[in-house]
Amino acid sequence: MFQRARSSRLPLKLSRQGRRYSSHYARTPEPAPPEIAHLIATYAQHLPRPLTLGTLLATGRPLTAESVQTSVSYAQAEIPRRLATRIRSLEGLPFIVGTNPYIARTLNGFRKSFLWSATYPAVKNLEENAAFATQLETLVQDHANDIPTMAKG
């Protein structure tokens, strides 16, 4: 690391070895705000309820206001749980993976969607269900490219 100058009268000089690394590319992922982190922790404690084929068939026929209400209640309970699980998984990745901009973008999208789904008011009638379904379609479109985006990183 230190080299003697050719003349013994000159001081030691420091030679650089290795590469220079910049923190420009590897930014620390933004932590979730405390209120969101607490909400995520609350939902992540509960395991997702499985959805069986029998349940799907029983819920869909005949289509009544009650079956629609049952379906939307299930969706409102499960979407935040499953998003919280995914968020926890992404937050648990090693630091170097979490600094990847594609992973960080997906994580932020999951957090935004989680906050929306966890704080959405309970659906009580068919009109509210239509509005919820429209918002849910937008949410699905927002996450349509998550897997290809994460594959880039």
Predicted regions and their residues:
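N-terminal mitochondrial targeting presequence
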Residues: 1-47
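Signal-transmission coiled-coils
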Residues: 33-153
